[in-house]
Amino acid sequence: MMAALREACRSLWIAIGYFTRIPVPASVGFSQDGLNRAARFFPLVGWLVGAAGALAYWLASRTVPAPGVAVAASMAATLLLTGAFHEDGLADCADGFGGGYTAEDRLRIMRDSRIGAFGAIAVCMALLLKWQLLMAMAAQHAAAAMAAMVAAHAASRGMAVSYLLTHDYARMEGKAKPVAQPMGRRDAAWAALFGGLPLLGFGMACAAIAVAVLLAARWALGRYFTRRLGGITGDCLGLAQQVFELLVLWVLLAWTSS
């Protein structure tokens, strides 16, 4: 039991170290197998990132009576904490899908670390939409907005990592090479549980609607990735996380506004 608990803690630290800028203990170490086992905890990283964003929002809202400024501070905190890890994937995918005519062209463009017009526009639009959704929710109920931050970060990561259960990897290089390994059903079940729990704070009906929307988007994006690339890449997972996060915020805003 204690050995299993220690291994779970180590896996959680590995997930935190991979997806955030938080320093991890040197004793944790790193291995591909360890990162694969850590996949179940990726949504818990979303809990951490969302909580950091909620805390930044709360602190900012105590200093200035402007929800828009507090939301911007919240978003800045999450970007700093993650190093814009998923936004980078969104930008790479936008450049690749927007500028490539074949799967090889798209993958080549996505490997280029430089950002192009499609990538810049995609990231700007995603950040603007996220800011607007959160600001609209915060203007109605600040507590709901903070809860939505945690729910959106957790659920989006839980749904994005599920591609490792069902889709093949299109290339064997890039940031996500270590994590883009087949995911076991047990790990997927844990990831789904960790990703879905925060949604229940908005009620069972709202959570069910959010999950249904995410599943539909997951199916559509999965087909698109397969048709355009022949599989998924780490950048695709970043794009998916960003899309899923926006969809969760959209559903939660619609629910709390009705």
UniProtKB/Swiss-Prot annotation:
The keyword Magnesium applies. It is an enzyme of class 2 (transferase). It comes from the Bacteria. Its EC number is 2.7.8.26. InterPro entries: CobS (IPR003805). It is found in: Cell inner membrane. The keyword Transcription regulation does not apply. Pfam families: CobS. The chain crosses the membrane at residues 41-61, 65-85, 115-135, 136-156, 197-217, 236-256. Its main location: membrane. This is Adenosylcobinamide-GDP ribazoletransferase.
